[in-house]
Amino acid sequence: MSNMEQDRWSRVKGRLRSSVGEDVYSSWFARMDLESVHDESVHLSVPTRFLKSWIQTHYSDKVLSCWQAELPEVNRVDLTVRSPVRCATPAKEVPAPVESRRDEQRPSAERSNGATPVSANHDALGGSPLDPRLTFASFVVGRSNTLAHAAAKQVAEGRRGDPVMFNPLYIHSGVGLGKTHLLQAVTWAGNAGTERKVLYLTAEKFMYGFVAALKTQTSLAFKEALRGIDVLVIDDLQFLQGKTTQAEFCHTLNALIDAGRQVVVAADRPPADLESLDERVRSRLAGGLVVEMAPLGEDLRLGILRSRVVAARTHHASFDVPQPVLEYLARTITHNGRDLEGAINRLLAHSKLNNQPVTLEMAEHEVRDLIRPSEPKRIKIEDIQRIVARQYNVSRSDLLSSRRTANVVRPRQVAMYLAKTLTLRSLPEIGRRFGGRDHTTVLHAVRKIEGLVSKDTTLSDEVESLKRQLQE
């Protein structure tokens, strides 16, 4: 892709991100690549049929309009599924950077022009492709991911028959913070010996496998293969759809846990927020160790950048990024590890293709589209409940209980009001998160506090103080 095409594609992606919002963009468009532009048509690709179908059904007009804003002559956008290439073993040396991946510090296992993945096959069930670069050795540990890394390492080092400490282990975070890296590292480490069977599956792969088994009347073999696994690793659980598929996942989850087998799951939100999943599944997932990977701090971002430069030198020995440039990138590219990966890739390409050393001026020009304005903090209902309980000297369980004493009712109403005004949750969902209350109860609380804050200056000050604490 020429520099002109790359710049054009970056602008189109920027328009698309602004149009649909960051969450939608990260979920559905982050792995979409530009293949070519010919006259009046654009050829894009995605790694899975599921993504292709969803984008074509829900966003085809949006994608076309974003391209037409850049190139008015475009009248057709073709979307295809790119095929992964398979390899045999994980890389033993420090990995070289490749094209950036959705959700992780490392690049996609399914990019045709990047890392070459490998599949793990166990009996009747084939696992999702594994990227040989995604190992514990290449994972950069920092304050925001220490607990997740330690828990994943504990799982990976377990032996068949050992007591299972964290089951299921549930890791959640925003896009590009290292979930898939850790899950694949668990799989590689677990399969390094011959003692245990460790299987890595994306939620999409699980869905397609189960549906295919139903169609071919091999569902029994599918179930037996899954339940014969010692460690089942499921990625991107938020994409698990369909009541029948969810029921089978729930049965598999219960069967493995009850048999003392390990389950590791990753998603982009905590179990309680997976509203599309059955309550039984959410409850079972929440019963294990739930670990959040927080946004990358500046020190961790700097560490990731340094590791990518070292990785690049395994193939390009003369490549170097001066410390001031690394510090600039760590300070200004704050969104996720994928953007940091992309920044190093761009500097490497520019330096090698133009035979120029990396400078601060070059970096400022090459990564300008990766520097995004600060986004407002995502506030969770659990945070609201915790801070309100602390403010009013009650417990979180009091807020969720049926108690109707004055010292509990008012804090509960304030918490519901803040949940409605500071989150995108619906009234029924807020009610469910406050002890299974009806949406009318939430609506009454919201209206009650709205009326009081306009007349009661003390309450108004308390609410504003709570908002500041939540937004810090």
Swiss-Prot record:
Name used for this protein in its record: Chromosomal replication initiator protein DnaA
**Gene transcribed to yield this protein:** dnaA
Database matches in Gene3D superfamilies? 1.10.1750.10, 1.10.8.60, 3.30.300.180, P-loop containing nucleotide triphosphate hydrolases (3.40.50.300)
A Pfam family that the UniProt record links to this protein: Bac_DnaA
Function text: Plays an essential role in the initiation and regulation of chromosomal replication. ATP-DnaA binds to the origin of replication (oriC) to initiate formation of the DNA replication initiation complex once per cell cycle. Binds the DnaA box (a 9 base pair repeat at the origin) and separates the double-stranded (ds)DNA. Forms a right-handed helical filament on oriC DNA; dsDNA binds to the exterior of the filament while single-stranded (ss)DNA is stabiized in the filament's interior.
| Basic and acidic residues biased stretches | 99-109
Organism, by scientific name, is: Rhodopseudomonas palustris (strain ATCC BAA-98 / CGA009)
Region annotation Disordered: where it falls in the sequence: 90-124
**Which Gene Ontology terms cover its molecular function?**
ATP binding; ATP hydrolysis activity; DNA replication origin binding; lipid binding
Give positions of region: Domain IV, binds dsDNA: 352-472
